Every structure is written in C-alpha cells, then in structure tokens.
C-alpha cells in the first residue's frame, strides 16, 4: 500500500517552494502527497509584492471530507501558516489524524 503524507502548506505561483516543491519531492520518494493548502499566493513572500488568498475558512472542509472518507496518513507535514487562526485549524487536523504511527514534521514558517 502506498504511504500518504498530508502536506499542509501554501501554493505559490513563483518561488520554487511550498506545495510546488513538496509534492514533487514526496512523489519522487514514492509517497502520495495529499495537499491541504493554507493559502494560494501569486509568488512566495520573498518577492517585493504578491497576492495572498487565505484558505483558513477552507481548511476544516478538507479535514471533514478526509475524515468522512476514512483517510489516514503515515505522515503530516506542516509548512507556511498564513494566519494565527490557521494554527488552531492545524491542531484540529492533527487531533483528527495523528496516531502513534504517524510521523509529524512541523516547519515553523509563519508569514
């Protein structure tokens, strides 16, 4: 059975980072990356200007739908957090899906 990692991170149009990089690397390892976007950005925050579409209100929808599907994850990886409110969403996600067999990797990036 293919291992799965929930990847909680942003998607940036420019910048070679976040979900764009994580999905590629995780997939190359033969693991299914299951992205849960925290935000969609026109470019990563290191650019002089960018547009950020905050996904805080959508994060719990992902959690609920994946829970209804009976999904489980071998790993949970968190990256860019767009707002303080997302921290609570991430804790709720971890409370739902984390088990003693789940690898948890927290990259403390908060924009």
Tell what function each PLM region has:
Residues 1-74:
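Small-residue (G/A/S/T)-rich helix-start motifs and N-terminal tracts that mark the onset
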Residues 78-111:
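Conserved beta-alpha-beta core of the PfkB/ribokinase-like small-molecule kinase fold
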């Amino acid at each position: 059975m293919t291992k799965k990692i929930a990847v909680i991170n942003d998607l940036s149009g420019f910048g070679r980072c976040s979900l764009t990089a994580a999905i590629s690397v995780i997939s190359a390892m033969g693991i299914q990356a299951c992205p849960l976007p925290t935000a969609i950005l026109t470019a990563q925050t290191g650019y002089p200007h960018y547009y950020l579409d905050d996904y805080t209100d959508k994060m719990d929808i992902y959690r609920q739908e994946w829970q209804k599907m009976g999904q489980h994850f071998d790993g949970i990886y968190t990256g860019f957090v767009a707002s303080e409110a997302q921290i609570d969403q991430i804790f709720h996600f971890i409370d739902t899906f984390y088990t003693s067999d789940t690898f948890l990797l927290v990259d403390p990036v908060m924009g």
